[in-house]
Amino acid sequence: MNIINITNKSNFRFMYKKEFLKIMDIIQEKFNFKKRISVDLLITDNKEVRENNLLYRNVDKETDVLSFPFGDPDFFDHLDFIPLGSIIISHEKIVAQALEFNHSKKREFCYLFTHSLLHLLGYDHKEEDEEKIMNQYTKEIVEKLNIYR
Protein backbone atom coordinates (compact mmCIF):
# COMPACT_ATOMS: atom_id res chain seq x y z
CA MET A 1 0.00 0.00 0.00
CA ASN A 2 1.20 3.49 -0.83
CA ILE A 3 1.97 5.92 1.98
CA ILE A 4 0.41 9.31 2.68
CA ASN A 5 1.41 11.23 5.80
CA ILE A 6 -1.29 13.80 6.53
CA THR A 7 -0.99 16.78 8.85
CA ASN A 8 -4.25 18.69 9.13
CA LYS A 9 -3.85 22.14 10.67
CA SER A 10 -7.19 23.39 9.35
CA ASN A 11 -10.58 23.28 11.03
CA PHE A 12 -11.82 20.98 8.26
CA ARG A 13 -12.42 17.32 9.08
CA PHE A 14 -10.46 15.61 6.32
CA MET A 15 -12.36 12.58 5.01
CA TYR A 16 -10.64 11.73 1.73
CA LYS A 17 -7.65 9.61 2.69
CA LYS A 18 -9.18 6.57 0.99
CA GLU A 19 -9.64 8.52 -2.27
CA PHE A 20 -6.14 9.97 -2.05
CA LEU A 21 -4.66 6.49 -1.65
CA LYS A 22 -6.63 5.34 -4.70
CA ILE A 23 -5.25 8.31 -6.65
CA MET A 24 -1.75 7.28 -5.59
CA ASP A 25 -2.45 3.70 -6.72
CA ILE A 26 -3.55 4.98 -10.14
CA ILE A 27 -0.43 7.18 -10.40
CA GLN A 28 1.78 4.26 -9.36
CA GLU A 29 0.31 2.08 -12.09
CA LYS A 30 0.12 4.77 -14.79
CA PHE A 31 3.76 5.76 -14.36
CA ASN A 32 5.06 2.20 -13.78
CA PHE A 33 6.48 2.62 -10.30
CA LYS A 34 7.69 -0.79 -9.13
CA LYS A 35 7.75 0.29 -5.48
CA ARG A 36 5.22 1.95 -3.25
CA ILE A 37 5.13 5.73 -3.43
CA SER A 38 4.97 8.12 -0.49
CA VAL A 39 3.88 11.73 -0.08
CA ASP A 40 3.61 14.17 2.82
CA LEU A 41 0.48 16.33 2.85
CA LEU A 42 -0.19 19.45 4.91
CA ILE A 43 -3.73 20.84 4.93
CA THR A 44 -3.73 24.37 6.27
CA ASP A 45 -5.08 27.88 5.75
CA ASN A 46 -4.40 30.63 3.20
CA LYS A 47 -2.05 32.45 5.58
CA GLU A 48 0.34 29.53 5.98
CA VAL A 49 0.24 28.70 2.27
CA ARG A 50 1.06 32.32 1.47
CA GLU A 51 3.97 32.29 3.95
CA ASN A 52 5.37 29.12 2.35
CA ASN A 53 4.84 30.50 -1.14
CA LEU A 54 6.87 33.58 -0.19
CA LEU A 55 9.54 31.60 1.64
CA TYR A 56 10.14 28.93 -1.00
CA ARG A 57 9.05 30.55 -4.26
CA ASN A 58 9.46 34.25 -3.49
CA VAL A 59 5.80 34.78 -4.50
CA ASP A 60 3.81 36.84 -1.98
CA LYS A 61 0.28 35.57 -2.61
CA GLU A 62 -2.13 32.84 -1.63
CA THR A 63 -2.48 29.80 -3.84
CA ASP A 64 -4.48 26.61 -3.66
CA VAL A 65 -1.58 24.19 -3.54
CA LEU A 66 2.20 24.04 -3.36
CA SER A 67 4.25 21.01 -4.42
CA PHE A 68 7.82 20.28 -3.36
CA PRO A 69 9.38 17.27 -5.15
CA PHE A 70 12.12 15.33 -3.38
CA GLY A 71 14.04 14.83 -6.61
CA ASP A 72 15.15 11.88 -8.69
CA PRO A 73 13.33 8.69 -7.56
CA ASP A 74 16.47 6.66 -8.36
CA PHE A 75 18.16 8.41 -5.42
CA PHE A 76 15.91 6.37 -3.12
CA ASP A 77 16.80 2.92 -4.53
CA HIS A 78 17.82 1.71 -1.07
CA LEU A 79 14.28 2.25 0.29
CA ASP A 80 11.30 -0.05 -0.20
CA PHE A 81 9.23 2.96 -1.28
CA ILE A 82 9.76 6.14 -3.30
CA PRO A 83 9.18 9.43 -1.44
CA LEU A 84 7.78 11.78 -4.09
CA GLY A 85 7.70 14.96 -2.01
CA SER A 86 5.52 17.27 0.02
CA ILE A 87 2.24 18.97 -0.80
CA ILE A 88 0.62 21.91 0.98
CA ILE A 89 -3.08 22.51 0.31
CA SER A 90 -5.15 25.48 1.47
CA HIS A 91 -8.47 24.29 2.82
CA GLU A 92 -9.86 27.81 2.42
CA LYS A 93 -9.00 27.82 -1.29
CA ILE A 94 -10.57 24.37 -1.71
CA VAL A 95 -13.87 25.62 -0.29
CA ALA A 96 -13.80 28.83 -2.37
CA GLN A 97 -12.89 27.05 -5.61
CA ALA A 98 -15.49 24.32 -5.10
CA LEU A 99 -18.12 27.06 -4.85
CA GLU A 100 -16.66 28.98 -7.78
CA PHE A 101 -16.58 25.93 -10.06
CA ASN A 102 -19.87 24.57 -8.74
CA HIS A 103 -18.67 21.16 -7.61
CA SER A 104 -18.03 19.37 -4.32
CA LYS A 105 -15.14 19.91 -1.93
CA LYS A 106 -14.34 16.23 -2.44
CA ARG A 107 -13.91 16.77 -6.17
CA GLU A 108 -11.76 19.87 -5.62
CA PHE A 109 -9.57 18.13 -3.04
CA CYS A 110 -9.08 15.08 -5.28
CA TYR A 111 -8.42 17.20 -8.37
CA LEU A 112 -5.80 19.37 -6.63
CA PHE A 113 -4.15 16.40 -4.93
CA THR A 114 -3.81 14.67 -8.30
CA HIS A 115 -2.56 17.90 -9.89
CA SER A 116 0.03 18.21 -7.11
CA LEU A 117 1.22 14.63 -7.51
CA LEU A 118 1.82 15.32 -11.20
CA HIS A 119 3.91 18.35 -10.20
CA LEU A 120 5.94 16.06 -7.93
CA LEU A 121 6.57 13.86 -10.98
CA GLY A 122 7.90 16.82 -12.97
CA TYR A 123 4.81 17.90 -14.88
CA ASP A 124 4.09 21.60 -15.20
CA HIS A 125 1.71 23.99 -16.89
CA LYS A 126 3.89 26.96 -17.80
CA GLU A 127 3.36 26.30 -21.51
CA GLU A 128 -0.01 25.66 -23.16
CA ASP A 129 0.92 22.18 -24.43
CA GLU A 130 2.20 21.17 -20.97
CA GLU A 131 -1.00 22.47 -19.41
CA LYS A 132 -3.14 20.37 -21.78
CA ILE A 133 -1.24 17.20 -20.91
CA MET A 134 -1.33 17.89 -17.18
CA ASN A 135 -5.03 18.75 -17.19
CA GLN A 136 -5.85 15.65 -19.25
CA TYR A 137 -3.93 13.35 -16.88
CA THR A 138 -5.57 14.97 -13.86
CA LYS A 139 -9.05 14.65 -15.34
CA GLU A 140 -8.49 10.99 -16.35
CA ILE A 141 -7.24 10.03 -12.90
CA VAL A 142 -10.01 11.78 -10.97
CA GLU A 143 -12.67 10.32 -13.26
CA LYS A 144 -11.37 6.80 -12.49
CA LEU A 145 -12.73 7.46 -8.99
CA ASN A 146 -16.12 8.33 -10.52
CA ILE A 147 -15.78 11.93 -9.35
CA TYR A 148 -17.07 14.37 -11.93
CA ARG A 149 -17.84 18.10 -12.08
Curated annotation (Swiss-Prot):
<dbReference type="GO" id="GO:0008270">
    <property type="term" value="F:zinc ion binding"/>
</dbReference>
<dbReference type="Pfam" id="PF02130">
    <property type="entry name" value="YbeY"/>
</dbReference>
<dbReference type="InterPro" id="IPR002036">
    <property type="entry name" value="YbeY"/>
</dbReference>
<feature type="binding site">
    <location>
        <position position="125"/>
    </location>
    <ligand>
        <name>Zn(2+)</name>
    </ligand>
</feature>
<dbReference type="InterPro" id="IPR020549">
    <property type="entry name" value="YbeY_CS"/>
</dbReference>
<comment type="similarity">
    <text>Belongs to the endoribonuclease YbeY family.</text>
</comment>
<keyword id="KW-0690">Ribosome biogenesis</keyword>
<keyword id="KW-0255">Endonuclease</keyword>
<dbReference type="InterPro" id="IPR023091">
    <property type="entry name" value="MetalPrtase_cat_dom_sf_prd"/>
</dbReference>
<keyword id="KW-0378">Hydrolase</keyword>
<dbReference type="GO" id="GO:0004222">
    <property type="term" value="F:metalloendopeptidase activity"/>
</dbReference>
<dbReference type="GO" id="GO:0005737">
    <property type="term" value="C:cytoplasm"/>
</dbReference>
<keyword id="KW-0862">Zinc</keyword>
<keyword id="KW-0698">rRNA processing</keyword>
<keyword id="KW-0540">Nuclease</keyword>
<keyword id="KW-0963">Cytoplasm</keyword>
<dbReference type="GO" id="GO:0004521">
    <property type="term" value="F:RNA endonuclease activity"/>
</dbReference>
<feature type="binding site">
    <location>
        <position position="119"/>
    </location>
    <ligand>
        <name>Zn(2+)</name>
    </ligand>
</feature>
<feature type="binding site">
    <location>
        <position position="115"/>
    </location>
    <ligand>
        <name>Zn(2+)</name>
    </ligand>
</feature>
<protein>
    <recommendedName>
        <fullName>Endoribonuclease YbeY</fullName>
        <ecNumber>3.1.-.-</ecNumber>
    </recommendedName>
</protein>
<keyword id="KW-0479">Metal-binding</keyword>
<dbReference type="GO" id="GO:0006364">
    <property type="term" value="P:rRNA processing"/>
</dbReference>
<comment type="function">
    <text>Single strand-specific metallo-endoribonuclease involved in late-stage 70S ribosome quality control and in maturation of the 3' terminus of the 16S rRNA.</text>
</comment>
